[in-house]
Amino acid sequence: MSIFETIIIAIVEGLTEFLPVSSTGHMIIAQNLLGVESTEFVKAFTFIIQFGAILSVVVLYWKRFFQLNHTPAPEGANGLQRFLHTFDFYWKLLVAFVPAAVLGLLFSDAIDAMLESVTVVAVMLIIGGIFMLFCDKIFNKGSEKTPFTEKRAFMIGLFQCISMIPGVSRSMATIVGGMSQGLTRKAAAEFSFFLAVPTMFGATVYKMYKIFKEGGTELIMDNMTTLIVGNVVAFIVAMLAIKFFISYVQKYGFKAFGWYRIIVGGIILIMLLMGYDLQIM
């Protein structure tokens, strides 16, 4: 990969990872337009640069990530309950993270097999887009007074499992999950960002473990400059994308993202019908 290709792909990652538009679908188009061959390193590159995107969330919301709950625990709470009350933010992240983590470990081979189908990505982009056209009306605007309980966190985690189908978009699934639990657009989007940190970090570390286990250490070390550039670009672009997204959805909702998904899915299907040999990076 050239530096130009590295930067473009990292920009695509940063722009699409936290927006409900499917980063996988955009990677397919970017790869084809750039003429990048889907080698083992290119596949590794596309998930390793997720570290940069993950870091953008931690930096933007560092106060939320490193602030404990110092309010008094409920009267009569035992030691465990007081502990969970203090670490309330991390506890609910863990509750939401577990469903996808368990399914990911149990069905990793089946998920990898689905990731080979570009048609599935295109179809799910369109189906998800149609749903997003109406999700604002279906779930209204939510309420800032809605208590964020462990049950609601777990339900969002179940929604995240749907995103294992390529083309759905992890961001879309978890945001819709949050809105279905009565959260506002902003609260649902922000928890989606927070949940991305353990989810994407865990998935990336697991994939890197598989690479190293299969003797891919040299593959990573020989391309360290490319990986560093990709992570830096993804970090910067993801920060800008998150700021834009939060501001936009508070004012206008998700309909524009629905139409956008339908267009992108349609483009991929047309390219397939025209005989393009599209591959997932």
Regions found by a protein language model. Give the residues of each.
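Multi-pass membrane proteins that catalyze or facilitate reactions on polyprenyl-/lipid-phosphate substrates
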Residues: M1-M281
